[in-house]
Amino acid sequence: MDIVTDKNIGSNFLADSNNRIYILIGDTDNVIDKYLVSILGKIEFYYVYEITVEDSKLINTFVTSNLLCPIKNKFNIKIYHDYKKVIGSCILNVDGKFTRYKDPSKLHVYVFCYRYNNCLNTCTMVKCHELLYPEKEIIVDGYKINDMSFFYTNPEIIKQHTDIKDYETLYKNIFLRRELNRVILGKPSDLIETLKEIVTINSEDIWKVIVSNDIFDSRDVIKLINFDYDREDFLSFVRAWYSNQLNNCKEDNNKIEKVYEIVRNSI
């Protein structure tokens, strides 16, 4: 998957037979604006969904569209295909406003639909507007944690620290970043399954990650896009490493097992 800074994104976007999916990280509204200007005359309709976390699961909610379905009062490309045949056309939303969303506890999914050779194609933008960082250090088992990627293996730890300002928002932000990390690295992800409820995704789709230039070289971004935080893989490594430390000294082994349990419960 190509990873670029928004500074390197030009003003000419392709609107061809390939469906495209862009993962936007940081304040990247300029990318959305460039896209709209570039293919404005070709867009047949658009819609926006938001993805957030409830009960440790991803949920998606319809936000808006320039078309409204009279039957369901919400819209996506699958509904469009179903009801276009039945009702002839959906209702044009004359509001005319296009909103850029910035809530860090949600991913916002913008789907732009256009026709190419009489086929309907999509350009999907999945935006994580901000990589949150707590105002105070988080202490886990006596250790100061100043790297938010620590929580990618187990975001639930954040919910234990209710003294952190807006800890629920931080928890959701970390949870969503963990899911983005899995998508970027090509790992199985609940986020992919959630996106499939919003837009058609095929193996031939072209993916790209676009990062705001002001955070492109930051530690948070580097770890988000480069490192694997699969919890089971981490547990396997930790188990093997600590097992290799065991010896014939019972006292040493008890210390090793105690530390192992602390680490295992923190992952």
UniProtKB/Swiss-Prot annotation:
Any Pfam family the entry gives: Pox_D3
Keywords assigned by UniProt, alphabetized: Late protein, Virion
Induction entry: Expressed in the late phase of the viral replicative cycle.
A GO cellular component annotation in the UniProt record: virion component
Cell compartment(s), UniProt: Virion
Chief location bin: virion
InterPro entries: Poxvirus_D3 (IPR007660)
The keyword Coiled coil is annotated on this UniProt entry: no
Protein family according to the UniProt entry: Belongs to the chordopoxvirinae D3 family.
Function recorded in the entry: Late protein which is part of a large complex required for early virion morphogenesis. This complex participates in the formation of virosomes and the incorporation of virosomal contents into nascent immature virions.
Protein name: 27 kDa core protein
